[in-house]
Each structure stands twice: as structure tokens, then as C-alpha cells.
UniProtKB/Swiss-Prot annotation:
UniProt subcellular location: Virion
Protein kinase domain: residues covered: 25-397
Protein's name in the database: Putative serine/threonine-protein kinase R301
Top-level taxon: Viruses
Gene3D superfamilies referenced in this protein's UniProt entry, alphabetically: Transferase(Phosphotransferase) domain 1
Sorted UniProt keywords: ATP-binding, Kinase, Nucleotide-binding, Serine/threonine-protein kinase, Transferase, Virion
InterPro entries: Kinase-like_dom_sf (IPR011009), Prot_kinase_dom (IPR000719)
Amino acid sequence: MNFNKFYNKFHDEPIDCENFPDIGQIKSTSVGSGGSDNIVLIVVQDNIKYAVKIIPTLFYPKYKEQPNDDQMEIKFYQFFTKRYILTDRTPHIVGIYKCKTCDNIRDFLLKIKPKKSCPTFEEKLLKKVQYTQFENQLCNLLLYGENKLMDSKFIMALLEYCDFDFSRYLRDLLQNVYQNNFGNNIGEFFYELTRILFQIIFTLAIIQDDYPGFQHSDLFIRNILISITDKYTDNEYVAYYYKQKIFYLPANGIYAKINDFGTSIIVNELESNTYIYDKQTNKIFHKNPFNHKNDIYNLLIDIYFAFDEYIIENKLDESKINPIINFMDKFIDIETINKIFEINYYQLKDTWYIDGISVLENTIKTPHDYIMSDVFEVFQDLPANAKIIRHFNSPRL
């Protein structure tokens, strides 16, 4: 909710590639999700947290033309920030403050690397080497550089800070519900999950309305980030407008944000340089950017598998499983998914794209159809004493 204010503060400040960020300002580190080569630094400056995403440029010898997915990801951040976040269309996308192409990635990596030597492969096999995932990533990148498989230039992007990703938050919510008074907490759990799903589905709907050829292509729970705010009063609300409907959410609470656009596309607007080749195989892999069910299917099936994993790990009995089934059935045809799950678990889990696969397409709706249905009616009543403090996607914008 404070993105616009922070954008005005950071956007015009130049980035000093040699001295930024100050090592003392780095509070935590992580690596990109889903096998990404990116690294992420959480920095605190003037009591404001933000994420610094470091995007190396790797060389792929088998390609005549090097894929530009990482450069396209930055363009998506910039596009969505300008088109949707700063204009109050939606706050549910991770915004970018600024970015810069810097030189000499080796010096940068050595500056932020812990004072440890990188282990050899033999040492990894024969010794109990205590290295974090972040440290391993740095060592791998340095190795790429030594073997001339990484350019000296890299992208440094300053992004909006979020507290954690949806996969972790979902697990924390489940722990709280099932280990601390199930009966009293299950309703609140489903309310919070409904809020998150509304925010993401609303955002997908307005983007797809504007750009029918948009597809995120990697919309799993690890790529949804979560921020939580409690600075507003209980009677302060935010309003969301879609077609003839208005939805009201308490200003306090969860704000889910779509992140990671490395495989995203808007046909004829933002396309990677490999899309011309991808089109030749899209039919084989059931991939179609104009299929508006694909992204929401990925998100819902990932939640389904997260629930399944938790149920198995904690050996939940039927009385505690049924509420989950009833909730998920509002969004996805659980009977059909369960049937496929029992017949071919691995095929279901490995199916990312569903264009032309009618048995999967029929289990869900498009984002537009979810919004126009009654599944989010809990957010359509505004309390009598409520005060609306922000309007998103208002027809007056």
C-alpha cells in the first residue's frame, strides 16, 4: 500500500554499481525460485526494506541466439509497475523501483560472498560441507564466470519488499489451524485464503481483459509473495471495481502479489526472442497464451498439492480433511482432480499447461468468470460505518 511513496523516493536515485548495496545494509539473502540463477538481497535503507534482485547473464552454447528471458522479466516489472501499480489498477503485483545494468559481476559476488572457499565437487561428496543454498549459488555463478559461461555484465533491480512467499505462508496458516483449536480457526483460515485468491484472480482478470494474450506461465504458490499490514483502523476498507461489481476488503490484512515474470508473455507486446520457436511446439505442450484458464489452474492445483502434502505429513483424519475439500471445491472440481490423482499422480503433478485438455480445462473457470460468480460475495457487503481509503480499478481512473 506504500509502494507509490517509496517509488517516488527511490526511482530517481542513481545506483552506484561499485558501492551499492552497503554490506551492512544487507539483512538477509536468498536465491531465485524454481531453479533460477538469480540471487536476492533484502536491504534496509533509512528504515525501509526492499529487495535487490541480481540477474546474471549466462551463456548457453547450444543457442545461436541467447535467450533474453531475464531482460524480458525486467520489462514486465516495469510495464506492470507503470500500467497497473502506479495507476491504482491493482496493488497485487510486485513493483520495481528502478534497475541498472552493472559491470564486473565477479567483484560483486566476491563482495557479498562469505569468507569461505568454494568446495570442490569431491569435497561435496566426501565431506559434510556446511553451505547454505545462497552460498552454493554464489559458488556456482563464480564457476560459470571462470569457465566463460557468464557475462561480466549483470542486472541489478530494486524491487518492492514482501514478507514471505505464499508457499511458506500457507504452511504457517495450516500449522496454526490444525495445531491450535481447529474449530475456532478454520473459518478464519478459509477467509484469509479467499482474500488471497480474490486478489490474484482479480488482478489476472483485469490484465487479461486489457491484454488477451497475457500468460504468466509460472503462477505457482512460490511465485506469489505476501505482505501484511496492520496500520489502518478496523473501519477502513479498500474497494475493487470489476465490470458492474464492487468488492470491499479491510485495509488491514494480507496483500498477495504476483512475482517472477521470467517466462511470461503478452503476445505482440512483450515477447521473448525465443517465442517464435516456442510457437512451433506450443500445441504439443498444450501451451496457449490466449487460454485464460492456464494460470489460475497452475495456482489452484499447486494449492491442492500443498494441502495434500500437509494432510499426508500430519496424518489428518477425515473430519479435518472434509472442510478443505469443501472449500477447494468452490474453485476447482475436486472430484475430477481426485480421480486423476488416484490414477496418475505424477502425470497430474507434471502437467503445467492445459490448453486443449478438456478434462482439466473443465475443472476450473477463467478469472473473469470467478469474479462474476458469487464465490467472492463475502467481500460485496460494506459495513455501515466503513470508510473507503483506496479505490482500485475504479471506472473514474
